[in-house]
Amino acid sequence: GGNGGSATGALAAVGGAGAAGGDATSGTGGFGGAGGSARGLIFALGGAGAAGGDASTGVGGPGGPGGTGTASSPFGIAIAIGGAGAQGGAGTSGATGGAGGDGVFEGIAVLGLGFGGAAGAGGAATGDGATGGAGGFGGAGAGIANFLGFSVLHGGAGGAGGTATGTGGNGGAGGGGG
């Protein structure tokens, strides 16, 4: 799937969403597109990643990562949010979920909010000995407030591991938080 476009705004910007990967009857599902990055003075939201394609017999496509949101405000207020990662595709082996995008405010803000995007879950796997996909890693929240300022930083949640259905199957590992 195609990647979302990046965005730069005078005050606010939102990155474009990625497009989903195609499904496959056998073989490998398509990669999910990545979310576009965003840069705005006061507000920035990274685009969401898109889901990986499923494979009936084979490996699912990886979920697309979320885009980075970056805010750099001369006005002292900056809100930056990373885009969400997407779920990995299902298959005989599940694919990895997409990572969440980082939310970063730059400079020395009076009020700065940086929130990492949540990660996508690993893809489900079906069949004997199947392995679920690993969950993606959550995005980071980053920035520094000045000595009179106030900041809130929050890392994104990691993605759940993919389920496995079948004899001798193994569920996927969960992703770490941002």
Residue spans for each PLM region:
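Glycine-centric low-complexity repeats
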Residues: 1-178
